[in-house]
From Swiss-Prot:
SUPFAM superfamilies: P-loop containing nucleoside triphosphate hydrolases, PLP-dependent transferases
Positions that bind (8S)-8-amino-7-oxononanoate: W374, W375, Y482, K655, G689, R787
Residues with N6-(pyridoxal phosphate)lysine modification: K655
The species this protein was found in: Oryza sativa subsp. japonica
Residues binding pyridoxal 5'-phosphate: G436, S437, D626, S691
Region described as Dethiobiotin synthetase: 28-283
Protein known as: Bifunctional dethiobiotin synthetase/7,8-diamino-pelargonic acid aminotransferase, mitochondrial
Superkingdom as given in the UniProt entry: Eukaryota
Marked site: Participates in the substrate recognition with KAPA and in a stacking interaction with the adenine ring of SAM: F332
Binding site for substrate: T72
GN (gene name): BIO3-BIO1
Residue numbers binding Mg(2+): T43, E194
UniProt cross-references to Pfam families, sorted A to Z: Aminotran_3
Cofactor(s) the protein requires to work: Mg(2+); pyridoxal 5'-phosphate
The protein's Enzyme Commission number: 6.3.3.3, 2.6.1.62
Amino acid sequence: MLRLLRHARRHSTSSSSSAAAAAVPLTSPAFAVFGANTGVGKTLVSAGLVASLLASPSPSPSTVAYLKPLQTGFPDDSDARFVFDRAPALLRRLRLAGGGASTRLVASNHTLFPSPAVDPLPERQDTVVNYGGEEGVEEKALVCRTVYAWREPVSPHLAAEREGMPVEDEEVRWLVDRWLAEEDGGGEVWKVLETAGGVASPGPSGTLQCDLYRSSRLPAVLVGDGRLGGISSTLSAYETLLLRGYDVGSVILEDRGLSNDRFLLSYLRKRVPVHVLPPIPEDPKDDLTDWFSESSSAFSSLKDSLQSFHSRRVQRLNSMQRKSKYLLWWPFTQHDLVPVDSVTVIDSRFGENFSAYKVKDKTIVPQFDACASWWTQGPDSNLQIELARDMGYAAARYGHVMFPENVHEPALRCAELLLGGVGKDWASRVYFSDNGSTAIEIALKMAFRKYACDHGIIVDSEKDIRSEGSVHFKVLALNGSYHGDTLGAMEAQAPSAYTSFLQQPWYSGRGLFLDPPTVYIKNKSANLSLPPSIMHDQLSSCDTCFSSLTEVFCKTRDTSSAANVYVSYISQQLSQYAMSNNSEHIAALIIEPVIQGAGGMHLIDPLFQRLLVKECKNRKIPVIFDEVFTGFWRLGVESASELLGCFPDISCYAKLMTGGIVPLAATLATEPIFEAFRSDSKLTALLHGHSYTAHPMGCTAAVKAIQWYKDPSTNSNIDLDRMKLKELWDSALVNHLSSLPNVKRVVSLGTLCAIELKAEGSDAGYASLYASSLIRQLREEDNIYARPLGNVIYLMCGPCTTQDSCTRQLAKVHRRLQKLN
């Protein structure tokens, strides 16, 4: 362990330090000691807890490991040395008082990385203490460590700056994770990590310590403040921890005669145990031996409550797989194909990673969320914390308020950002709803009304309807499309597994569905695939093969042979449909711009979609972009319309809009679309909504996420010159993947990298189980939580995910596919 930590700085000097995911065992308890302030007695509590643990009768921990990651004022002040010095003496007293077995304690204390300003350097301390008893000998160990130590007795961020020893957050986290993962031989091990200062005191980089240690999410022991004002600081610290997703196992504080403990016991009842310590002597000459003896019952009670907390936590985690199989009904899941032991138990999330509990091993393991939690997630760990804080504020300020005829700041600000971002230069109105499918239904209603007005189906200012019974509206859409699971949205998509009689017996498919040309990467080049329905005799290799996707998106292709073929095909299909369906009207075009998601992660030729939009606008057919999946930097730009080079009349957004943390959707529209609903009658208004329209929490989250994504000070992936994301997936690795013999195609764009495996017959398509073994290996051995679309596997990150992280995950997939060969 010591050698590992000494070499850690070599391996953990950048964000790539988290490359090797540490499995943290829950076979033994581990807690973090936080303080409501500095000087509240965190180290006294740590020492008392350690001594109580070592003195516990069997079964008791054979080893107690104490870690002080950050120490200032060193070596005059050393909390690890205090624990090392005091715990053995306290154990002797407790043993004399309680009897029991003879004990042999092996204790050590060491500082790993002292600042260059620390002089003289302290030596490692080792001691062996024997305590007599009436029974056999118990072997105990106390391992105390200080990781980073600075000389000046100031906040770590100041000490690091002044003494020239900066430490990155990832370095601290890496070391803590390795310490937690270390198992010291046989027997139970308790681990106690003591933080520095208060809950929100800065670490060496300036990151608050409650944020710095959040990745480990150790249950907290909160040392409260018994002084005047301590009630406020204790509760503030408690709520700060809760807001960041920590569990607080216990609160403990000194009785200073101000009844702080009585108030906290009352306020926190049924939430968390509160333990009270006797007053700490103020005489600096007092060695606190008598105080520790007097406090032994409080520390024993603290130890018992923490043990109970840990046992309840593990018991619940162990039961969740089995219970989920009998209580839950998962979407898009055939339960008979999911063994109980394959259910992923998610303890928490931190940035792009799940903390998954492995029931068999009883460990917590970070898993990269390669599904971006079903395409919604955008936050890194910093944005996650910001969203939690802002949403808490919105919930406390607004709760929920109804929206029609009302306005509140989160909704108004969100609308301003939407119109100035994804809706810039074309949209003027924002219609809020709850999710993507609902946003699509609203968009269809908007488009149909506009079409009816433009084509004389609705006449005069009263919106009288001509020949209502004989008018049938259909959509123009693409095969392979997917627009949601509500009935109206399903009618606007082509027949598929999602719309079959088994899933939607009412489905009729109200549209003309065209076969789209697609683009994919194979053998290091971008290739155009044309469906049989599109004639392509006129096309040469320069029309169907490209050196990169950049060429595919180039607008100079508008005058190419491919453009002529597309225009002819689109015009012919629309004309033929109009001639054969006199009473039916193509009243809207609806497309997923650039990428079809649920249909298999296909990249539709942007030239085809651009010309399709142009033709529909020429025919006064309203155009809907379904950007529920593609919007807000999913494809490397804020809106996929930037890639297409054209604007819709209506567009739908959700998922990434709120950072994925809470459902909210918006349908944006042009002013002419809005005008189609205006009159003196309420019956002509858009009568569609839900109880939580524009709910303040969702709008607040969207305001934060939308601004965060595009700000280079918060998102280092933004290329300011082009206002695009930097390339997140290593192009050389993508090309290597595309050249593997078992890979049919690769699509790499923005935050998405999709890989279709070569498969035939029933091994291909949505129902395929072809990728099951690969997915299992990625989850269980590579710590990547992936979920396939049949024989298509994909990795998806957030707009803020580092390039290093993307490269690591993609390299793991590459290695697996090589072995699969």
